[in-house]
Amino acid sequence: MITVALAKGALLRESVERFQAAGLDFSAVLDPDNRQLMVPSTCGRARALLVRNGDVPVYVAYGQAQLGIVGYDVLREHQMPVAHLVDLGFGGCRMSVAVKNTSGYTRATDLPPHCRVASKFTRCARQYFDSIDLPVELVHLTGSVELGPITGIAEAIVDLVATGRTLRDNGLVAIEDLFHTTARLVGHPLALRLDQGELQSIIDVMQRSPHDAVGVN
């Protein structure tokens, strides 16, 4: 039986639609009354694990799921040994450095050395600031990172930015982009090597335009 890891949250609906196009229907996870974390497909030949975003590559890396869909930002941050298979193109946003709009900073190199930077993505932030040779103190937060500059716990933040509305509503502005992120299909390397074609048929469908995809049998 094929097991796939699906992330709760913003990527879930489109992830379910992509697997539906490949012949695996996990639409039951979209039911607001659903409380199951392991959901079988309607065809009975696969199941989905409904997990937190950051846990998708963990389940795939340890072989509890053969496939998963997760944001590139999570893959960059966690760096788990999974196979990067397809850039699915949805869920696009930017990993950015942001500051108070009254700070006067216009680029990351304007920040003072050894200032505090708040982020949920401390590995990505560290790699970026190391690349521009700017020493900073990273403050790990798990939510509402925008409060960092507002409360004074940090001079800047590194976080995902889609429309920028949340930043604007909190008096912040993005001054530098680290990278662009989209949803990616990932796989367990050994499972892919041992695959008898079933996983590859799903991957092949995922590689097509979602408008052209036809479910596999």
From Swiss-Prot:
NCBIfam families under this entry? Answer: hisG
Give me the Gene Ontology terms describing cellular component. Answer: cytoplasm
Could you tell me what this protein does? Answer: Catalyzes the condensation of ATP and 5-phosphoribose 1-diphosphate to form N'-(5'-phosphoribosyl)-ATP (PR-ATP). Has a crucial role in the pathway because the rate of histidine biosynthesis seems to be controlled primarily by regulation of HisG enzymatic activity.
Entry's Gene Ontology BP terms:
L-histidine biosynthetic process
**Could you say which protein family the record assigns here?**
Belongs to the ATP phosphoribosyltransferase family. Short subfamily.
E.C. no: 2.4.2.17
Query: Lineage in the entry?
Result: Bacteria, Bacillati, Cyanobacteriota, Cyanophyceae, Synechococcales
Entry text on domains: Lacks the C-terminal regulatory region which is replaced by HisZ.
Q: What is this protein called?
A: ATP phosphoribosyltransferase
Major site of localization recorded for this protein: cytoplasm
Describe the subunit structure: Heteromultimer composed of HisG and HisZ subunits.
**Pathway, per record:** Amino-acid biosynthesis; L-histidine biosynthesis; L-histidine from 5-phospho-alpha-D-ribose 1-diphosphate: step 1/9
- Organism in which the protein naturally occurs: Synechococcus sp. (strain WH7803)
